[in-house]
């Protein structure tokens, strides 16, 4: 291999999300991964510094979030209704993501592979629930932004995503919802 890993990561900007929905503005997995990293870092800090709960390193949570969709460089973005249609499809797609992640790791110099392995394969232990919460929060924010632009296409997704976040029972996520989410509904002059 010619160390294609970083070049492929640069192509994240070409993989759009929400492919089954009419969007007022597109979102790619590079933008999404950045937002998830910011949110994962925030959730970990909230958990540790505001709620006083044990938490993994917030900086490592941000790094885990940066790579949480890296396998989609090779697989594309599978729409959620398909990915989670039933347990068999979910398990099969997880296997596809794992194979894609292994393939990405092969594109790194061997000396770097172990440093990236946990992040690319999402084997991040106690960081994973925070990254998953941040991922869901990012999806919710996308719904809110689309609704704010007058797009009712995201109304059902907004309700379903909010319900899914509440089911996660993550106190740091609930704190963010209660204290930080409302400003996403405001325009620039209102902020």
Positions of PLM-derived features:
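Alpha-helical, largely C-terminal catalytic domains
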Residues: 1-191
């Amino acid at each position: 291999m010619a160390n294609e890993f970083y070049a492929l990561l640069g192509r994240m900007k070409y993989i759009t999300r929400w492919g089954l929905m009419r969007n007022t503005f597109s979102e790619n997995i590079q933008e999404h991964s950045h937002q998830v990293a910011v949110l994962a870092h925030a959730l970990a800090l909230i958990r540790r510094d505001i709620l006083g709960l044990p938490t993994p390193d917030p900086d490592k949570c941000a790094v885990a979030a940066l790579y949480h969709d890296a396998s989609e460089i090779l697989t594309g973005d599978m729409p959620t209704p398909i990915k989670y249609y039933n347990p068999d499809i979910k398990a099969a797609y997880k296997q596809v993501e794992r194979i894609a992640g292994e393939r990405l790791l092969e594109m790194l110099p061997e000396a770097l592979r172990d440093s990236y392995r946990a992040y690319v394969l999402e084997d991040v232990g106690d960081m994973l629930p925070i990254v998953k919460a941040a991922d869901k929060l990012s999806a919710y924010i996308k719904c809110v932004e689309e609704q704010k632009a007058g797009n009712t296409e995201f109304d059902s997704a907004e309700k379903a995503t909010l319900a899914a976040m509440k089911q996660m029972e993550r106190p740091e996520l609930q704190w963010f919802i209660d204290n930080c989410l409302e400003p996403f509904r405001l325009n620039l002059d209102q902020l």
